[in-house]
Design a protein with these regions (language model features):
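Hydrophobic transmembrane alpha-helices and their immediate loop junctions
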Residues: 2-297
Length: 297
């Protein structure tokens, strides 16, 4: 029987052909005709590469350059060693805090002629965590004073006690609220809690004063470093990342921790000088002021 003209029919089976011409009706699991070609799968976002840290060869070279530079500006192997050791302990304080707060594994980088840098694998989860990380360096860094104070007292050596004083001053200067020092990262979120513009105005003003202080006291490398940092902050449009602002209780705790850390660092610096002044506080305080070039009698 022939198919009725004008109506479609199933294709006839040809036993001599290897091709199946039978028309198959779409099943319930087939794509609709307009979606017969599946859309390409979205590209996977590549996971951020893990920071492997400073290359060992460059780390050794940077440390040697830093040690030579410190010896050149201090004229003392002991004081240069104290400053270098203090830098490592300071940065290790940041590393411990980063690892504890889920930002690790953090790495330490030595930057010749400037200092060190602790770098985590990810950003802090909140501004409060950022404050804790920034204050961990100066607070933990004071531990580096212990061996130099002990040897200085045992040998009655002014050189070793001066090394301990330098370690305390490294941590105290880092608490200046000038970008990119630790003080700006600890105090900046507190100022932002009051008003977003207050952080920018206050930190840039303090940064400018710090540059002027460096130039006026002959600390030209520090002044250049701070000047570049302040300029880069001026070019940046957004200061605070999307971590969420501090709550008022967190802002209060941040300010209290900042002031307490600064007070402990200042007391440690004066304490390291007390054996050199026979235990007299006022002469030790004057020695500290003369060191930072802001006065002293």
């Amino acid at each position: 029987m022939r198919p009725v003209a004008g109506r479609s029919s199933r294709a006839q089976f040809d036993p001599m052909s290897d091709t199946d011409h039978t028309t198959r009706r779409p099943g319930p699991w087939d794509l609709p005709p307009e979606q017969a070609t599946p859309e390409p799968a979205p590209a996977r976002k590549s996971a951020p590469l893990e920071d492997k840290g400073q290359h060992p060869a460059w780390a050794i070279a940077s440390t040697l350059l830093m040690a030579g530079f410190l010896w050149w500006i201090t004229g003392s192997v002991v004081v240069a060693g104290a400053v270098l050791f203090g830098l490592f302990v300071h940065e290790y304080g940041h590393v411990l805090a980063m690892n504890r707060l889920g930002m690790g594994p953090a790495r330490i980088y030595i930057i010749p002629f400037l200092g060190g840098l602790a770098k985590g694998q990810r950003e802090p989860k909140s501004e409060w965590h950022g404050v804790l990380v920034s204050l961990a360096g100066p607070a933990f860094g004071l531990i580096a004073m212990a061996p130099f104070v002990a040897v200085g007292l045992a040998l009655k050596s002014p050189e070793w006690l001066t090394g301990a004083f330098f370690i305390a001053m490294i941590n105290l200067v880092n608490l200046l609220p000038a970008p990119p020092l630790d003080g700006s990262k600890a105090l900046g979120p507190v100022l932002t809690r009051v008003h977003p513009r207050l952080e920018q105005v206050a930190l840039l003003a303090v940064g400018g004063l710090a540059v002027w202080w460096g130039l006026s006291t002959g600390r030209f490398i520090l002044a250049a470093f701070l000047g570049i940092a302040v300029f880069s902050h001026l070019k940046r449009g957004v200061w605070r990342t999307a971590w969420g602002r501090l709550s008022w209780p967190e802002a209060g705790r941040s300010l209290a921790l900042y002031l307490a850390t600064a007070a402990v660092c200042a007391a440690a610096a004066i304490g390291a000088l007390l054996p050199l002044t026979g235990g007299a506080v006022e002469p030790a305080f004057d020695m500290g002021l003369r060191f930072i070039g802001v006065g002293g009698r």
